[in-house]
Amino acid sequence: MKFVDEAYIDISAGDGGNGCVSFRHEKYKEFGGPDGGDGGRGGHVYAVADVNLNTLVDYRFSRRHDATRGEHGKGSDMFGAAGNDITLRMPVGTIISDAETGEVLYELLTAGEVVTIAKGGDGGYGNLRFKSAINRAPRQKTPGWPGERKNLKLELKVLADVGLLGMPNAGKSTFIAAVSNARPKIADYPFTTLHPNLGVVRVAAEQSFVVADIPGLIEGASEGAGLGHQFLRHLQRTRLLLHVVDLAPFDDSVDPVAQAKAIVGELQKYDAELYNKPRWLVLNKLDMVPAEERAARVKDFVKRFKWKGPVFEISALTREGCEVLIRTIYKHVHEQQQIEAGPKEIDPRFVEVEGDGVDLTDPRFAPRDSE
């Protein structure tokens, strides 16, 4: 399930330092000659593709990024130090374009790829540069060049890690609004969500996952009822499904267990692979159930539903139980990412060997027949 994540940033590379006008002062030497150094170059702004990131959410809260300017030149032939570079880490697949013209400038397609998105200005020349046979005591210098300044648009096609599954009005939109930066339409009638909504859940610094709120399913979705084919197809590439169930429906004639079974039936009819995907049960609207009845109602639901997988009891409205759920989700998603990445290749030259440092299993050290 792909969405487009966008962010806008303003970047400034550092200006170059100014050149210096200075003359050498030595004892018994009245005219020591020029010794003014050049200014240092300004800091560059780099972008690097980081495989551990999957969204642009950090750049929504941090729009401006400035590198430092180079130091000015000094006397005694001292050149100014270069400004500090800054490196912006972005997910693999990020498209960087000019925010005003829309021109695509860079694409980060491979992990570890580095591009210079703004170059620092060159340092100005000190008067040492202008010394000649004719001009023995130059007083010229040049200012540093300005660094590049750009307004950029970052765009990323995001693959949702987690999909929310459930009947209309089960509280999926309320949940995604409670745990992420998404603001879906929320109301007390079914089919509030008419299009998939994307939310980025930040667990900690540089720890996040993407959750997708799919429009509520109805019976017959596997045959296409209620745009069922389109919505079910969105769930196929997620790593985890959360089956959200309204534990306290307003209509007493509605049986949550029957509704949950209907959803599972639609999954099974549509695609066996989707049905076998990791799925967790999330019992929502816990705040509507009296405290003394909660344990019994949850136990009864799980028993009648014949559920043997993970169960989470939450209230999306009050956020009760949400913190534990999102941290558990992140752990699962992170583990899946590590598995998909595969084992890292290890250079055998750097493998530590116990004992005297000789690997006796190496065929080079096998005993010869003459021995």
From Swiss-Prot:
Enzyme Commission number, as recorded: 3.6.5.-
Binding site for GTP: 166-173, 191-195, 213-216, 284-287, 315-317
Example GO BP: ribosome biogenesis
InterPro entries: G_OBG, GTP-bd, GTP-bd_Obg/CgtA, GTP1-OBG_CS, GTP1_OBG_dom, GTP1_OBG_dom_sf, OBG_GTPase, P-loop_NTPase
Residues bound to Mg(2+): S173, T193
Residue span(s) of domain Obg: 1-159
Domain OBG-type G: 160-334
The protein's required cofactors: Mg(2+)
Single GO MF annotation: GTPase activity
Enzyme class: hydrolase
Compartments where found: Cytoplasm
Gene Ontology cellular component list: cytoplasm
Keywords: Cytoplasm, GTP-binding, Hydrolase, Magnesium, Metal-binding, Nucleotide-binding
Function field: An essential GTPase which binds GTP, GDP and possibly (p)ppGpp with moderate affinity, with high nucleotide exchange rates and a fairly low GTP hydrolysis rate. Plays a role in control of the cell cycle, stress response, ribosome biogenesis and in those bacteria that undergo differentiation, in morphogenesis control.
Family: Belongs to the TRAFAC class OBG-HflX-like GTPase superfamily. OBG GTPase family.
HAMAP family assigned to the protein according to its UniProt record, in alphabetical order: GTPase_Obg (MF_01454)
Name of the protein in question: GTPase Obg
Originating species: Delftia acidovorans (strain DSM 14801 / SPH-1)
Name of the encoding gene: obg
